């Protein structure tokens, strides 16, 4: 793989504009190559010289010079070449002169008088610009993580004091304990010098389990530097040992418990309890309660904060390494093209720069590792490093095979189903309408689920193809996000079992042996639905447990809106539910059909119940009400008026859906429906559809920008073909108005009414799948524009001084 592709594949996608523009520098080198080819014609082809083969063959009998050359065995030619190159650099004969100024790195090209020198001068100017830009960005990010490190230091002080308070509520007698520890350090200073000479370093380190959590942060004792000191020479003077012992004992003192007087528990209002307390302005909401439950919550929050902070450090380390490597590669290409030796002096300056010498960052990484292992992994290095550096998932061949196998099963079952319906009369014509009004809504639920999962898998495929960091956008834990193969496997598996149930149902209808067990025949879709629900909530580690629980958590947040803090996965799932209104109605029909015993006689008496009719309004409006409440909470917390307008969009949709439901019920139960209800349903639906379409294009997709360099689109596009965006907008409008069928009562003669409703619902799901890609693409480009590659993590403690700054 060429380095340009390797760089683009390994870079942090949200920082892609901050990396060195390697392709642009290569274009400058290509211009130099073109100039060289014009001025210097290619050399004539090489012809073999008589005796050349013999002389080359004679070299096979020379004495072996060794794999590693010693100074005495170096050849004279290499010594002369090394000497000449050193002279070139030392005497100023190098082609460039690199210096450091207040504006950054500046390179003076010393051979502009040569032919084509102006092209090389432009190359080095652009190279300096790229380096200074990269180093400036790197400095800013390092300063940010250093500020975060200071904040984490304060959080660790508070955590240790909190831990001491919980595990020793009576108190330790801090002043007396300090005096005793100081006196003890003085008494054992002399004996320590003798013991240290004969005791290994690992044995000298005190490691009582009871005090492992109580001592102050002394992770530096585990660093390589101190290990080297332990294996070095033994101190000879007693005074040195006494001083080191005093410092060690002073560092081993417990954290000052007075820290707890200056902190408060950070109430993020992320749960219903904290939200209700925040609304009621409870005076005790920030009071610290010292118990084991609060300690565990604080440790979990701080543990998550350390994991995210460590990921920041790793990304910065990768950023530094890739950019330094890019400068090295491009300079080697320059040397090869121009036959100069400019890379040595330039890379020497790069290595000595802030970007090249990342010692401060490396020490911080080691410090974070040792701190995390000690305080959050109980001293187990492997356990701690597995949390800090989760292993990347490998694509398994059995997943690909299972996906293809299940897809083949679906295709075969569909062919078999069509053949059975066409060739065998499974039921009389009179029972066909009853079957479509009862069993079809039950089985269509699985069709909606499979179609939505398939559309999501297609989205994942194209997100990966265009390098959209969807895992970061959705907040997935590293290594737990599903690929499109895994998602397709889930969807095709559900589809296979659903089609098996349909075929089983039809077979039991015509089989004389099973025809008497009609209630059992009707229960097949219910069994499948219950099985899917059981698998979804099963706590065992199989079938993507983390993803299942992540989905259930987001679903709970949608149902309990606005009590939970709204995150992108929550409102993204809420938008998906707005496209599954027909599926929610199917679930409502499940409750009615099986709860009231209609399945025993295959009768649909649900529509005769007022409770069921009212539930249709609630079920159809529930997803939009959830999104409305989420928008209201975001408007209050973020003080964003756009969220208020977004809430108006969902309010209009709730009104439109309710009026369409009422009109559909009136059409079904009365011969002459009132015209004013039709007008209200149609006008409200048109108003809501126009508002939603405008919001999709402008806010969710970021399109229709007149001033953009891509007219009527946006400045940055991941798909190079602009026509794709215009086609998507047209399709979105067409599919958005698919609900017109419910108002105009337009029906196809060859389709049953339930089939028509299923087709319209499927079109809405397909529109949502298309919407998903461009919505996440726009979110990714916003992250790229703001260089946002990290998640903001709430910390468990607030210091009084921080509150004063906020005030």
Curated annotation (Swiss-Prot):
Its main location: membrane. Keywords: Cell membrane, Membrane, Phosphate transport, Transmembrane, Transmembrane helix, Transport. Expressed at low levels in roots and leaves. May transport inorganic phosphate (Pi). PANTHER family: PHOSPHATE TRANSPORTER PHO1 HOMOLOG 2, XENOTROPIC AND POLYTROPIC RETROVIRUS RECEPTOR 1-RELATED. Belongs to the SYG1 (TC 2.A.94) family. This is Phosphate transporter PHO1 homolog 2. It comes from Arabidopsis thaliana (Mouse-ear cress). The gene is PHO1-H2.
């Amino acid at each position: 793989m060429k380095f340009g592709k390797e760089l683009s594949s390994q870079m942090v996608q949200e920082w892609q504009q901050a990396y060195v523009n390697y392709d642009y520098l290569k274009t400058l080198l290509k211009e130099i190559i073109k100039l060289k080819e014009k001025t210097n014609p290619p050399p004539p082809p090489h012809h073999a010289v008589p005796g050349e083969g013999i002389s080359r063959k004679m070299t096979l009998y020379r004495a072996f010079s060794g794999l590693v050359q010693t100074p005495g065995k170096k050849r004279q030619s290499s010594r002369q070449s090394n000497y000449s190159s050193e002279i070139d650099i030392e005497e100023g004969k190098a082609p460039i002169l690199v210096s450091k100024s207040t504006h950054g790195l500046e390179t003076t090209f010393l051979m502009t008088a040569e032919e084509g020198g102006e092209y090389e001068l432009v190359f080095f100017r652009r190279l300096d610009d790229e380096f200074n830009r990269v180093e400036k960005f790197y400095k800013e990010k390092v300063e940010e993580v250093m500020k975060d490190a200071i904040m984490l230091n304060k959080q660790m002080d508070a955590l240790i004091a909190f831990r001491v308070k919980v595990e020793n509520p009576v108190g330790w007698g801090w002043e007396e304990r300090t005096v005793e520890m100081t006196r003890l350090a003085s008494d054992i200073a002399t004996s320590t010098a003798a013991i240290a000479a004969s005791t290994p370093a690992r044995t000298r380190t005190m490691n009582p389990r009871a005090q492992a959590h109580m001592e102050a942060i002394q992770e530096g004792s585990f660093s390589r530097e101190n290990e080297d000191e332990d294996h070095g020479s033994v101190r000879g003077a007693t005074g040195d040992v006494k001083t080191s012992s005093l410092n060690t004992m002073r560092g081993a003192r417990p954290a000052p418990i007075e820290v707890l007087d200056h902190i408060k528990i950070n109430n993020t209002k992320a749960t219903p309890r904290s939200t209700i307390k925040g609304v009621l302005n409870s005076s005790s909401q920030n009071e610290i309660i010292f118990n084991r439950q609060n300690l565990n919550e604080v440790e979990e929050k701080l543990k998550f904060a350390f994991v995210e902070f460590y990921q920041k450090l790793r990304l910065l380390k990768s950023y530094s390494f890739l950019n330094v490597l890019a400068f090295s590669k491009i300079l080697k290409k320059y040397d090869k093209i121009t036959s100069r030796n400019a890379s040595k002096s330039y890379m020497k300056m790069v290595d000595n720069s802030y970007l090249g010498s990342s010692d401060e960052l490396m020490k911080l990484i080691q410090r974070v590792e040792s701190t995390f292992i000690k305080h959050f992994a109980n001293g187990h290095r492997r356990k701690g490093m597995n949390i800090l550096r989760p292993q990347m998932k490998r694509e398994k061949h059995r997943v690909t095979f299972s996906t293809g196998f299940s897809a083949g099963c679906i295709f075969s079952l569909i062919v078999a189903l069509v053949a059975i319906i066409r060739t065998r009369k499974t039921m009389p014509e009179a029972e066909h309408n009853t079957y479509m009004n009862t069993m079809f809504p039950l089985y269509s639920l699985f069709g909606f689920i499979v179609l939505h999962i398939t559309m999501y898998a297609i989205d994942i495929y194209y997100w990966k193809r265009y390098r959209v960091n969807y895992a970061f956008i959705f907040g997935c834990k590293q290594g737990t996000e599903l690929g499109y193969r895994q998602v397709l496997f889930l969807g095709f598996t559900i589809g296979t079992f659903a089609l098996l149930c349909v075929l089983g149902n039809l077979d039991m209808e015509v089989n004389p042996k099973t025809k008497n067990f009609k209630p059992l025949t009707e229960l097949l879709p219910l069994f499948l639905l219950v099985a899917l629900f059981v698998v979804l909530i099963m706590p065992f580690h199989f079938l993507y447990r983390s993803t299942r629980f992540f989905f259930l958590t987001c679903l709970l947040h949608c149902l309990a809106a606005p009590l939970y803090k709204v995150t992108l996965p929550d409102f993204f799932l809420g938008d998906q539910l707005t496209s599954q209104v027909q599926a929610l109605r199917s679930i409502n029909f499940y409750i009615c059909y099986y709860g009231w015993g209609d399945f025993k006689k295959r009768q649909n008496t649900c529509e005769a119940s007022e409770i069921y009719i009212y539930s249709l309004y609630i079920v159809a409006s529930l997803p939009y009400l959830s999104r409305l409440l989420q928008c209201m909470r975001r408007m209050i917390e973020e003080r964003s008026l756009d969220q208020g307008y977004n809430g108006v969009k969902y309010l209009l949709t709730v009104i439109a859906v309710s009026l369409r439901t009422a009109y559909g019920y009136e059409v079904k139960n009365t011969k002459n429906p009132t015209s004013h209800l039709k007008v209200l349903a149609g006008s409200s639906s048109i108003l809501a559809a126009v508002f939603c379409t405008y919001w999709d294009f402008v806010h969710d997709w970021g399109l229709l920008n007149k001033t953009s360099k891509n007219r009527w689109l946006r400045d940055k596009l991941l798909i190079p073909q602009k026509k794709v965006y215009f086609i998507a907008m047209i399709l979105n409008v067409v599919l958005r108005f698919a609900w017109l069928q419910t108002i105009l009562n337009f029906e196809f003669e060859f389709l049953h009414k339930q089939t028509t409703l299923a087709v319209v619902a499927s079109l809405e799901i397909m529109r949502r799948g298309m919407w998903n890609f461009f919505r996440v693409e726009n979110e990714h480009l916003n992250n790229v524009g703001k260089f946002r590659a990290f998640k903001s993590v709430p910390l468990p403690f607030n210091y009084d001084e921080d509150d004063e700054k906020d005030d």
